[in-house]
Amino acid sequence: MILLSWSHARVPVYGLGCLEVHVPIEIREERPDDVAAVRDLNRRAFGQDQEGNIVDALRANGAVLLFLVATLNDRVVGHIVYSPLSISRNITVAALGPMAVLPECQRQGIGGKLIEAGNQKLKDAGCPFIIVVGHADYYPRFGFKPASGHGIKCEWDVPDDVFMLLVLDRAKMKAVSGLARYRHEFSSVS
């Protein structure tokens, strides 16, 4: 599936500086020829290799529920990965992350478009909820709230306001509580 949306972008124009223009952003599933671009994207966005190593390990171990990329003029400018996450009673849900957007393309809504597209695909697939460890001032824009309010704790020692959950199916969510455990790839790579 391809989702095409329009986004504002600052485009350099010789002699005029940067102009705000509407450009088509394509959101699609990752393809094998995107792997190198995604690795470079992670390195540039995070300033290190750890997140790229996690993405590579998840992909290599078949632990990806959904992997979307955002492209601008056929160039990968963002990506989002969802992987399985288990809750105490053998319940599997989706963990969002890593997600990255090229530094020069940030603050243009690309990350938001990736989150919205990915969350909708998971909702359509019947996923009860999505967990994220992320910025407390960013993810609530998309409906994420502290997971502790639903009786779910993170296996890692992280502040309550950065361990968040987005409910996709309230009926399936009612009986769920416990300790959320990420896949081993998140703690076994550096």
Where do the model's predicted regions map?
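Short amphipathic alpha-helix that is part of the acyltransferase structural core
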Residues: 14-54, 61-77, 170-190
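Short hydrophobic/aromatic beta-strand or adjacent loop that forms the aromatic wall/cage
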Residues: 65, 161-164
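Conserved beta-strand in the GNAT
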Residues: 67-69, 75-85, 92-100
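Conserved glycine-rich acetyl-CoA-binding loop
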Residues: 75, 89, 102-113, 125, ...
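Conserved acetyl-CoA-binding loop-helix of GNAT-fold acetyltransferases
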Residues: 96, 107-120, 132
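Conserved active-site alpha-helix within GNAT-family acetyltransferase domains
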Residues: 124-128, 133-159
